[in-house]
Amino acid sequence: MEVISIFGPKHGSLISLHSSYNLFKVSKVTRFRRTLFPSNHAKVFRFKALTCDNQESNNMFKELPTSEWTHHFHSIQVDVSEMDAIRIEIDALKPKVKNILMSFQGIDSTKKRILMIYMLISLGLACQFEEEIYETLKEGFGKIEEMMANEEDLYTVSIIFWVFRRYGHYISSDFFRRFKGNDGNFKKSLIGDAKGMLSFYEAANMATTKDYILDEALSFTSSHLESLAANGACPPHMSRRIRNALNASQHWNMEMLVAVEYISFYEKEKDHNEMLLKFSKLNFKFLQLQYLQELKVLTKWYKEVDFVSKLPPYFRDRIVENHFFIQTLFVESQHSRARIMMAKYFILLVIQDDTLDRYASLPEAESLVNSLNRWAPDHAMDKQPDYLKFVFKFILDTFEEFEKELRPEGGSFGVCATIEEFKSLVKANLEAEKWALADNMPSFEEYIEVTGVGITAMTTLMGAMMCMGKIVPKEDYKWLKSRPKIIQALAIKGRLMNDMKGYKEDMSRGYAANAVTCYMKQYRVTEQEALKEFEKMVAVANKTVNEEFLTTMGVSRLVLKLAMGVGLMISITYSEDEGYTHPEGKIKEKMTTLFVDQIPL
């Protein structure tokens, strides 16, 4: 199999990439700080660097443990012949599964087809049948009223609702009113239906700001599912699936992690289809091997760039973790190049963030930002330390490599647009540092406006669009420039979840202004009261993201799907602590599942 081995570490002459499109104005100060957490293995370093004023500046930081993954995947061997053999088996099974999916006819058969689509999604096979799924849902949505008439099965109604919303069809939540009794509450007869209650819970996680009945459903299903899983009323494999869903709903979980769990669950179902089961295992195994190939390419590139010898140890060593988090954006086999590019793009984001936030003196930071704004070194850069010159050169060279890769297919526009957004990012980060040093405590609303409006959410989505190449039209970049509502909701979600996990460490580093402290001071509430309110705000942001995904017009579904992926990335990152800075624990478990653990074929 061929792996995209692009963008070698060629740090030669710099070129200037000028955009003929002035799409991105410099926004107000925006900040999506990656907070630092105490670590048992952290070491405190103090370095002295010569500033452009010929004054020494003390740089203190905590050295985080290096990633345990980089060396592992750099030395791993992938059996290409095994991939070829698996591909042959997949190609043989795919038409057989397609025949099953497309053989259903009529209204009831459309229901069965949608139920099978849900199974394909859960098994990680939906990407194999995108065209068939699209046609099925397009046809079925036109018959939705007829299809749902007289349907009293909670599982069926919930799955149909979930699948349509998954693919951007705004199906009404009023269909669930049939499951309420005369007292206005959900019928008690539903409680013992574990399969139906779980699907209803999953549907409730697709709620928009106007789906009030789904708010009731989420509370109703969550409490009863916990009891079902705990009291032994369900088979062990169903109890485990319920617990996994309560920890992370399918809507807010990574597709291939869901697939691993569902394959294990499905195998224990008495009525499982052996061919589907085998197909799903082969598909996961093939993708896993492809991911390992990509990681080998990335770790080779990372070692050749040689950050360790060229930078003080202030930066987060996370190239493999980058690839993991990118699974929220690109999971399909055909997006190998996009994953590799995006992992490198994340290195750019992290290096600039750690340099400005954790290490550089203010004069150094100003010189770096000024040079990046001009896309050429300023006079002060000549006097800066070697580490800063390396950071500047690395950023320009990497964007140059992106441009060289995408230019032949007409993707230069996306690179230029992303460069402009990157400039806005570093400017905003610099201004935020100045603001923090001024020891100013803003209002909560000002803090959210200044630090939340679209910086990492915006820059991440822009980079993902760039990595997709020419298939993303120019109009979508113009749409993103307008800071649409979905981006604002993602930014608020990320800002609040970030500060909820890291505000104590922010304060220990001298940053008094964060969402928690601003809210506590302004509204005179306790820490726990503030955190409880933030949880409510994050829930509203999630509903807004869901709503905008279903209702936004004038932009491709591809970009809206990428925006949903950014929201998922935020959820995964901050599900427990700050998973990017400290990927130990749950993130490590998930990475092991995706990259290391084997599914027996």
Swiss-Prot record:
GO cellular component: cytoplasm
UniProt remark on domains: The Asp-Asp-Xaa-Xaa-Asp/Glu (DDXXD/E) motif is important for the catalytic activity, presumably through binding to Mg(2+).
Underlying gene: TPS15
Protein name: Terpenoid synthase 15
UniProt remark on cofactor binding: Binds 3 Mg(2+) or Mn(2+) ions per subunit.
Record: residues binding Mg(2+) 3: N498, D506
Organism per entry: Arabidopsis thaliana (Mouse-ear cress)
Record InterPro entries: Isoprenoid_synthase_dom_sf (IPR008949), Terpene_cyclase-like_1_C (IPR034741), Terpene_cyclase_plant_C1 (IPR044814), Terpene_synth_N (IPR001906), Terpene_synth_N_sf (IPR036965), Terpene_synthase-like (IPR050148), Terpene_synthase_metal-bd (IPR005630), Terpenoid_cyclase/PrenylTrfase (IPR008930)
A Pfam family recorded for this sequence: Terpene_synth
Top EC class for this record: lyase
Summary of the tissues where the protein is detected: Predominantly expressed in siliques but also in stems.
Requisite cofactors: Mg(2+); Mn(2+)
Entry's family note: Belongs to the terpene synthase family. Tpsa subfamily.
GO BP: diterpenoid biosynthetic process
Main location per the UniProt record: cytoplasm
Sites where the protein binds Mg(2+) 1: D353, D357
Motif (DDXXD motif): 353-357
Binding site for Mg(2+) 2: D353, D357
Pathway named in the protein's UniProt entry: Secondary metabolite biosynthesis; terpenoid biosynthesis
Subcellular location: Cytoplasm
